[in-house]
């Protein structure tokens, strides 16, 4: 897929596999609470990729897992440069692939707590530096500091910075999930079908994409019970 889009400036990083190894040998401190070894493998793999990113002088990096599907770009009515020019100046992370068990919001928005997936995101250098400083200790990783709600990749990366989300890309259902395979039919599939429906049908009727890239700073941030007052 990267070859098709003529993407040449990329680096593949081998991941940690926690399916048959609890990975305690790469951790410093206590084993993180309420996390499976597969989740530990996912989090540490992303931190490993950030360390590689910081060896360059790039101001930001586009992180993709092997199940990321960028074929939605065929239906875009804009270019990557068009989108990048509209990104909030103070962002730390832009989540670009979303699994939401309730509803996926197509407009750029401050990430909801149930916007799951680290299949693809854009991260700034300064946020990667922060995460590496907090969680990388030499060749080992420290995940026992009490990240809320857990130190899984979504929470660790997104909740620690100014994170926005927009479903520009998808994820490949046929590859399953090495972390929560039971969620494929329940959460992944419904989000997948909704996002594909948007890109294949609704997006073709959009003449001006600026409203989709202009986030509402108040959306989803009003205290419970305050609505309508």
Give, region by region, the residue ranges found by the protein language model:
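An acidic/histidine-cluster motif and surrounding catalytic segment
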Residues: 1-64, 68-229
């Amino acid at each position: 897929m990267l070859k098709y889009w003529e993407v040449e400036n990329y680096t593949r990083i081998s991941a940690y596999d926690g399916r048959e190894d609890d990975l305690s040998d790469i951790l410093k401190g206590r084993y993180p609470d309420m996390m499976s070894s597969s989740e530990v493998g996912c989090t540490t793999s992303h931190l490993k990729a950030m360390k590689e990113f910081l060896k360059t002088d790039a101001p930001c990096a586009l992180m993709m897992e092997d199940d990321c599907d960028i074929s939605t770009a065929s239906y875009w009515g804009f270019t990557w440069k068009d989108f990048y020019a509209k990104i909030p100046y103070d962002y730390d992370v832009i989540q670009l692939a979303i699994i939401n068990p309730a509803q996926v919001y197509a407009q750029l928005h401050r990430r909801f707590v149930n916007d799951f997936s680290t299949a693809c995101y854009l991260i700034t250098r300064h946020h990667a530096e922060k995460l590496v400083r907090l969680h990388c200790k030499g060749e080992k990783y420290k995940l026992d500091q009490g990240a809320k709600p857990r130190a899984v990749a979504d929470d660790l990366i997104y909740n620690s910075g100014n994170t926005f989300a927009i479903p520009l890309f998808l994820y490949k259902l046929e590859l399953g999930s090495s972390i929560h395979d039971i969620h494929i039919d329940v959460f992944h599939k419904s989000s997948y079908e909704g996002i594909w429906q948007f890109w294949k049908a609704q997006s073709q009727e959009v003449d001006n994409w600026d409203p989709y890239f202009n986030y509402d700073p108040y959306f989803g941030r009003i205290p419970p019970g305050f609505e309508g007052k």
